[in-house]
Amino acid sequence: MLKFYQMKYIFQILDKMRCLRKRSTVSFLGVLVVFLLFMNLYIEDSYVLEGDKQLIRETSTHQLNSERYVHTFKDLSNFSGTINVTYRYLAATPLQRKRYLTIGLSSVKRKKGNYLLDTIKSIFEQSSYEELKEISVVVHLADFNSSWRDAMVQDITQKFAHHIIAGRLMVIHAPEEYYPVLDGLKRNYNDPEDRVRFRSKQNVDYAFLLNFCANTSDYYVMLEDDVRCSRNFLTAIKKVIASLEGTYWVTLEFSKLGYIGKLYHSHDLPRLAHFLLMFYQEMPCDWLLTHFRGLLAQKNVIRFKPSLFQHMGYYSSYKGTENKLKDDDFEEESFDIPDNPPASFYTNMNVFENYEASKAYSSVDEYFWGKSPSMGDTFVIVFENPITIKKIKVNTGTEDRQNDILQHGALDVGEKLIFSKQIRQCDTYLRLGEFKNGYFEMSDVNQKIPFDIHCMRICVTKTQKEWLIIRSISIWTS
């Protein structure tokens, strides 16, 4: 039998535990949610045996439902499913078929300036008739001010009626009732309350936009509502995607500013929407996108140059403050991505760390780096199949290492392939020309060379003290 003082002591302990439980509930739920998110991202990618998957799903569903944390989190046990939101169609016709690419824009009322119409105009004007058949543009008017939304819908329908009728342009709105709490949020990074509210709502705006676009196309690119596009950007994107066939990627970046020009597989959009919604109050959208990429095991940024999209807004959507950010890698005219057919690479230069030969051939922003090359050193590209080349361009050195260029070199092409124990190589070569200031370019190669090319070789014709960076090798075929 327990004595009175023992009972009193037990009740004191229980009371302390209740207080501790109250104080730790929020932090515990935060850890729980992160864990469940990771486990769902993990199991959706088929890394776990089916029996373990089912156990994890049942556990995660039970925990989330039992806590009833907030209404936003109720359905998050299935990250591959869309969020249950009833959208308002402000201007749209039914999408008759799935497109290749959806371009997503989210827009709110600005205190100064309005760039949305110019952004939509740029998307359509910079696309050819054939490209227009493969794109859809979804605009989320995310402001809760209905008068502003009505005015914007009127402007959009007047200027782009034919695109709406053709099913290329849809204007939607996610009602305020679906939004989580936006006031009284924690002030991470010591941001002022209005800034926290702005960026938190922006995360939810994009989450609902991504959720809507999950089944409209094969790929999705995220833009802001104050962006100018490069001419024929869709053709450039398709070329890049084709060049990465067989390569795992989560995010491709076609701009270096914020979340402009981030490209995703559409099948990843539900998970990304859930992710933004779950952590909406934690940090800005572009930071969350970086974490999402890492969670899905894409370690490095895959960014392409030149950029396809340029920020053009002068006044920010936050308080109308000045925003002069520009992408200095942007090019207005056609982004002529090289074909760079499949090939193998060989060099007898002393390679620095992991800057291997193949990196000079990639359209990603990386390069080959070799230590002080000697006369007679070579960098050889052997194509899987003989090709007809229209144009060749080779850049050496970088902006911050302008001395690491090929000071004395030449470029050769070969026809007949031979095999040895070490490498595949061509037995005879024809010299196309010399490098000038570390640069080589030649057009109409197919009119000057009477054979299909199986090998291409960069030769060092004089020893140099400086190291050598081959920044890019670009080949266009006919």
UniProtKB/Swiss-Prot annotation:
Pfam families: MGAT4_cons (PF04666), MGAT4A_C (PF23524). It is a single-pass type II membrane protein. It catalyses: N(4)-{beta-D-GlcNAc-(1->2)-alpha-D-Man-(1->3)-[beta-D-GlcNAc-(1->2)-alpha-D-Man-(1->6)]-beta-D-Man-(1->4)-beta-D-GlcNAc-(1->4)-beta-D-GlcNAc}-L-asparaginyl-[protein] + UDP-N-acetyl-alpha-D-glucosamine = N(4)-{beta-D-GlcNAc-(1->2)-[beta-D-GlcNAc-(1->4)]-alpha-D-Man-(1->3)-[beta-D-GlcNAc-(1->2)-alpha-D-Man-(1->6)]-beta-D-Man-(1->4)-beta-D-GlcNAc-(1->4)-beta-D-GlcNAc}-L-asparaginyl-[protein] + UDP + H(+). Its cofactor is a divalent metal cation. It comes from the Eukaryota. InterPro entries: Glyco_transf_54, MGAT4_A/B/C_C. The lineage of its organism: Eukaryota, Metazoa, Chordata, Craniata, Vertebrata. Its EC number is 2.4.1.145. Residues 1-25 are cytoplasmic. Glycosyltransferase that participates in the transfer of N-acetylglucosamine (GlcNAc) to the core mannose residues of N-linked glycans. Catalyzes the formation of the GlcNAcbeta1-4 branch on the GlcNAcbeta1-2Manalpha1-3 arm of the core structure of N-linked glycans. Essential for the production of tri- and tetra-antennary N-linked sugar chains. Does not catalyze the transfer of GlcNAc to the Manalpha1-6 arm to form GlcNAcBeta1-4Manalpha1-6 linkage ('GnT-VI' activity). GO terms for cellular component: Golgi membrane. The chain crosses the membrane at residues 26-43. Pathway: Protein modification; protein glycosylation. Glycans are attached at residues 84, 215. It is found in: Golgi apparatus membrane. Belongs to the glycosyltransferase 54 family. Residues 44-478 are lumenal. This is Alpha-1,3-mannosyl-glycoprotein 4-beta-N-acetylglucosaminyltransferase C. GO terms for molecular function: alpha-1,3-mannosylglycoprotein 4-beta-N-acetylglucosaminyltransferase activity; metal ion binding. Its main location: Golgi. Keywords: Glycoprotein, Glycosyltransferase, Golgi apparatus, Membrane, Metal-binding, Signal-anchor, Transferase, Transmembrane, Transmembrane helix. GO terms for biological process: protein glycosylation.
